[in-house]
Amino acid sequence: MTKETADGHFGHFHPYTSTNSIPNIQLAFKWGNYLITDQLRTKSDRIGDKGDRLPMVPHFRPFFLPFSVFSVLLLAAQGLVCRKEKVSPVGMNFGAMNVECGQYVQHCAHVGRNNHSGLRSVGVLSARRKQSEFVAPVGEVHAFVVKCMQSVGTSEAHAAQLADLLLDADIVGHYSHGLNRLCIYIEDVASGVKGDGEPKVLKQKGATAWVDGCDLLGAVVGNFCTELAIKLAKEHGIGWVVCKRSNHYGICQHYPKKIANAGLLGLSFTNTSPIIFPTRSSQIGLGTNPISCCANSREKGDGFILDMAASTVALGKVEIAKVNGKSAIPSAWGADSAGRPSTDPLAVLDGGGLLPLGGVSEEDGSHKGTGIAMMGELFCGLLGGASFGKNVRSWREVQKAANLGQCFVAIDPECFAPTFVDNLQLFLDQTRGLKPRDPSKSVLVPGDPERMNSERSAKAGGVIYSEGQIRDLEELAKKQNVDMFPYKANL
C-alpha cells in the first residue's frame, strides 16, 4: 500500500523481498529544488508487497541509466548478503531505502500479514514520518467489534465480552492486546473456536475449582473463571480456579482488575503459544506466559496493577513497533530464527521469536525469565490438564485447538491484617515519592502508565488510535463487510 502526498510524491518501499523477486527499477530525478525518490515493482508478496506499481514521476533522462545500473548492482549485493546472513533486507535499511527530498519526503508502506506467530495485523508506516492520531467513540468501537465477531457466527453476548476486553487494552495503552488482535479472534472462530456456549465446572473442592473452557473464546472463559474465583473467595477467603481448553484471553490484567474491584486481591496466569527461546536454547520452547496481580488501594482509582510477560516484552509490542513503522527494536526484545538477538522486528516476527525476561544470557538474568515462564506452565498447563510448553499449538495452526490453561486467584485481604488497603496506599505513595534519577521522569508504580493512558483517552473523548491502526481496521472492516467506526483527528 502506498500513500500519495500533496505534491504527488511517493516514498518508502521494499526493493527486495525474496531471492526469487525480480525488481523492475526506475530511478527518477529532478535537478534543482528537490530529489524525487525511486520507484519499484516486485512480483513477490513474501512480506506483503503486492507488486503494485507506483505512479511515475518526472525524471531527468540523462541521469537515468547510470543510476539504474548502480541500483541494480546495489540490490544484487543486498540479495547476496541477505541470503548469506538470512536476515530481512528491510532490517538492513536497504529494504527501507529512502531518498530524501527535503520537505517533500513522506514514507508509507504495507507489509505482509503473516508472521512467525500467525498474528495477522500489520500495515506499516515508515518511522521517518510521524503518524497522525485519531480518536473514536468508545461505544462505536465496541459495536464495531461485536459486528465483526458476529460476522463469523459469534453470539452477541460473547462478542460483547470480547469487545470489553479489547477496549480495556486500548484505553489503558496496551495496543498490542487491543483491536490489534481482533483479526486473530475472528479467524479463531472462523476456524472452529466456539462462538457460543458456557464453560463447565469439572471439579470443585473447598476454595478450588477446575473448569473446562469448552474451546470458547478466552474472554468468555476468563470471565467465567474470574466470577467463580470471586464467589469462592467470598465464601472461603480465597478462590483458586484453573481451566483447560481455553483460548487466548487477551490482556492479562483484565481479570485481576475485576477481582480487585470486588474488594479482593487478584491474580491471573495463562500459558501461550511457544514463542520464547529459553536460556541457552536455539529453539523456541516456551510461551510468554504472562502474569498479573491487582489490588485497589484507599484512594478511588488508585491501586497496584502488575501485568507482565515472562519475555522482555509481549509479542504484540513487536507487532505494534512494525505497525508504527519502527525499523529497529531493542536488542533484548527478540531474536532471529537461530535464537540470535535481533533489532529487526521483521526478523523476530518472520521465523524468529522473543527472548526471556533478562535477555539472552545468565549474566543478564535471562534464566529468571525462563523460570517465570516455566512457573506459569505449572499453574496453567500442568494443573489445568491443558497443553504445555512446546506442545501448545503455534499461532499459525488455527485448525488445531489451542487448549490453553489459565489460572485465576482471588484473595480476601480481610482474612489477614486489617490495614491492607491503607498500607497499600502508603506503600504506593512512598514509592512514587522517591527521588528520581532524572528530574523530568517521576518514579512510577505498576498501574501508573495505565492510569495515565486512561486519563488521556478520557480527555480525548474516546479511544486513541494511530494512523497505521486505523488503516488496518478499515481493511478489516471491508473484509468482514461491516461499517468502520467513525473517527476524527486527535488534535
Predicted regions and their residues:
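Phosphate/diphosphate-binding glycine-rich loops and adjacent basic-rich segments that engage nucleotide
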Residues: 276-349
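Catalytic-core signal marking the mid-to-C-terminal active-site face
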Residues: 128, 132-136, 140-141, 378, ...
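Active-site cofactor/substrate anionic-group-binding motifs, chiefly glycine-
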Residues: 180-228
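Buried hydrophobic positions in well-ordered alpha/beta secondary-structure cores of metabolic enzymes
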Residues: 162, 166, 259, 293, ...
